[in-house]
Amino acid sequence: MNNEGKIMRKILIILSALIFSFSVANAKIILKAGHTANPDEPYHKGMLELKRIVEKETNGEVEIQIFPNGQLGSEKEMIEGLKLGTVDITSPSNGNLTNFVPELGIFDLPFLFRDRPHMYKAMDGAPGKKLSKAMSKKGFRLLGFYEAGVRHIMTTKKPIKSIDDIKGLKIRTMGVPAHVSSFNAFGAKATPMAYAELYGALQQNVVDGAEAANTNYNSKKFYEVAPHWAQIGWTALVADLIMSEKKFKSLPKNVQKALLKGGLASAAVERKAYADSDNSLLSKLKARGVKVTYPDPKGFREASKAVYDEFVKSSSSKSILKAIQGM
């Protein structure tokens, strides 16, 4: 090969390297986000806001693809997917993440929050920040705290008017230790099972009832098989908008910044959507023939004391509980 040919070959190599570098530098980052809710529910609205903010802040460098309705798996499977790299972002209920980050169990206690503003204060204040650090140590980056609704009790055959009415009933719960203990303390037979199996289990009398929020009681049409709806507010569920800490740190700084900004905006949208939905649905449910009762919470609160004794033992959990109750 003559000198002219060698020079041309070097030029082509350099140009190829530059083109490759340019294409890599400008390759779009695709993030897969999954949740188990319907597209018209608050979780999805929150994730749409995350997508909007992040894509805008990064000038299209990042694309967030959202998969609702458990397309990427159950909440537990999606949490595991973060570790495996098959899922980038998800928003499990706090109880399911507690299996990976035990410190989060404090948010699963019954009658912990007085009302929504109190819950948001705990999420966004010192307790939430402390729990965010605990998540980070276990490999999860918190982008924002969602809510999963104020929870009530549905039953298939008889209404719940007092704590005595729940005794002996098989009530579906999530597989969250504090939730299982709560319903056992109420006198029910707590029966953990997958959310996707619940409608059929109610229909076939495998369970006598379940706990849920107004929003998912309505959206999943549980009223068709469990028409008795007791407004007890036994807990207000926290949900965690998270991604893998490893994945988060692998992203460019501007993308990290956009995700954190988007996470806060996303949480604000999701919370408002949940509050608005909860407040507007009760009259619609009554119009559908749902039999709504308002049990006296006193007996439930008294029974809950045993759950606190069981789960609030460490100095750290006692400190966080004291901070929440003092807000």
Whereabouts are the PLM-identified features?
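Intrinsic-disorder/low-complexity regions
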Residues: 1-2, 25
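Positively charged n-region of N-terminal signal peptides that target proteins for export
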Residues: 2-11
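Sec/Tat signal peptide C-region and signal peptidase I cleavage site
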Residues: 7, 22-27
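Extended hydrophobic/Leu-rich segments
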Residues: 12-13, 166
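Bacterial N-terminal signal peptides
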Residues: 14-21
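Hydrophobic alpha-helical membrane context
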Residues: 21-22, 44
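N-terminal secretory/targeting leader peptides
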Residues: 28-118, 126-127, 133-327
